[in-house]
Structures are given as structure tokens and as C-alpha cells.
């Protein structure tokens, strides 16, 4: 069992149940999945770029990502239908908690000029999205072997019904919110 998963079961769930006045323990918000998405616009010109992006995301997530393809052709972006334009990976269970632990304790402090993450990136349904500008903040990525700096989107899906519940859950996991 992952460290944050144990913390959730022993401490966080009880605190949230008391704070929001839930009658059942099944009402308490919990993490469902974490989705990592990397859009690779350079893959249109060079196919090898996609292989490097997949390798980076594999190192970060610990499992092989699926290559996402364009749903329709867009002439302005020089994209054809079915062309590889990104990669994504969905983490659940123990891997999800392990990634979250590494992200909060190791990766976020390595961001340049880090002052906390925005508390306004909630979607209104209890989910949180955060963008990372450089993949080199993760310790699994070796700086010397990176061909290009790529950003990625991290989407945290929870069972929370409101943004306040989700923010309380993530704050209990020691997310460094700005305000």
C-alpha cells in the first residue's frame, strides 16, 4: 500500500467526514484516477519526436502511454485524420498514489520560481487540472538525455461533488496551493 493511500485511509477520510458532516463513509471524496496527457505538436513534422515523448511519459508514469490520434483533419495545423499528435496515460490504484506522492514531494519543489499551484484550476465538478511546463522536474527524466522540453497536463479526477470538497481532499494530501 502506498504512503498516501495509507494516510488517506487512516487520517484524511475521517477528517473530511467530520469537516463536511457526511453520514456514510462512502460519501467521503476520494481519488479516482490521474491522467497524464502530453500533446506533441512537433510530431506532425517528425515521427521520432513522438517516440521520445512516449519514452519520457513512460518514465514519469511507470507504465506505457497510449498514443492519441487526430479525430479529424485540420489544414491550418497541417494535421491529417488518424495522425499521432500526443500520448496519454491513466493511473489508478497504487500507481496513482505513488505518482501523486512523487509529484507533490519531489517534482513540484523542483519547478523554477515555484510559489504554489493555482487554487482556481477546478472544473466545478470536483476535479483538478494542473499544467507542467517542463518534464525535467520529474527525477526519472535525465536532463542530458532530453531532446526537447515538453509540457504535460495532469488531470486529477475525484469523487468530490464540489470544488471545496476536492480542494480539502488535495490540501489534506499536502498540495501546495497559493492561497
From Swiss-Prot:
Assigned keywords, A-Z: Ribonucleoprotein, Ribosomal protein, RNA-binding, rRNA-binding, tRNA-binding
Annotated GO biological process: translation
The UniProt record lists the keyword Flavoprotein: no
rRNA-binding in keyword set: yes
CC terms in the record's Gene Ontology section: ribonucleoprotein complex; ribosome
Alphabetized SUPFAM superfamilies for the sequence: RL5-like (SSF55282)
Gene3D superfamilies (alphabetical): 3.30.1440.10
Any GO MF annotation of the entry: tRNA binding
Role according to the record: This is one of the proteins that bind and probably mediate the attachment of the 5S RNA into the large ribosomal subunit, where it forms part of the central protuberance. In the 70S ribosome it contacts protein S13 of the 30S subunit (bridge B1b), connecting the 2 subunits; this bridge is implicated in subunit movement. Contacts the P site tRNA; the 5S rRNA and some of its associated proteins might help stabilize positioning of ribosome-bound tRNAs.
Subunit structure: Part of the 50S ribosomal subunit; part of the 5S rRNA/L5/L18/L25 subcomplex. Contacts the 5S rRNA and the P site tRNA. Forms a bridge to the 30S subunit in the 70S ribosome.
Family from the record: Belongs to the universal ribosomal protein uL5 family.
PANTHER family membership: 60S RIBOSOMAL PROTEIN L11-RELATED (PTHR11994)
Protein name, per record: Large ribosomal subunit protein uL5
Amino acid at each position: 500500500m502506498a504512503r498516501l493511500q495509507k494516510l488517506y485511509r487512516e487520517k484524511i477520510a475521517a477528517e473530511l467526514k467530520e469537516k463536511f458532516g457526511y453520514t456514510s463513509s462512502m460519501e467521503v471524496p476520494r481519488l479516482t484516477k490521474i491522467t497524464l496527457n502530453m500533446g506533441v505538436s512537433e510530431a506532425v513534422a517528425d515521427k521520432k519526436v513522438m517516440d521520445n515523448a512516449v519514452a519520457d511519459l513512460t518514465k514519469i508514469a511507470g507504465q506505457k502511454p497510449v498514443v492519441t490520434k487526430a479525430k479529424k483533419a485540420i489544414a491550418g495545423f497541417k494535421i491529417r485524420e488518424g495522425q499521432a499528435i500526443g500520448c496519454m496515460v491513466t493511473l489508478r490504484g497504487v500507481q496513482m498514489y505513488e505518482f501523486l506522492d512523487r509529484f507533490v514531494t519531489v517534482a513540484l519543489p523542483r519547478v523554477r520560481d515555484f510559489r504554489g499551484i493555482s487554487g482556481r484550476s477546478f472544473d466545478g465538478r470536483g476535479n483538478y487540472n494542473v499544467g507542467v511546463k517542463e518534464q525535467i522536474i520529474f527525477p526519472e527524466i535525465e536532463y542530458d538525455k532530453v531532446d526537447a522540453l515538453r509540457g504535460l497536463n495532469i488531470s486529477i479526477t475525484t469523487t468530490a461533488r464540489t470544488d471545496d470538497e476536492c480542494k480539502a481532499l488535495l490540501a489534506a494530501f499536502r498540495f501546495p496551493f497559493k492561497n
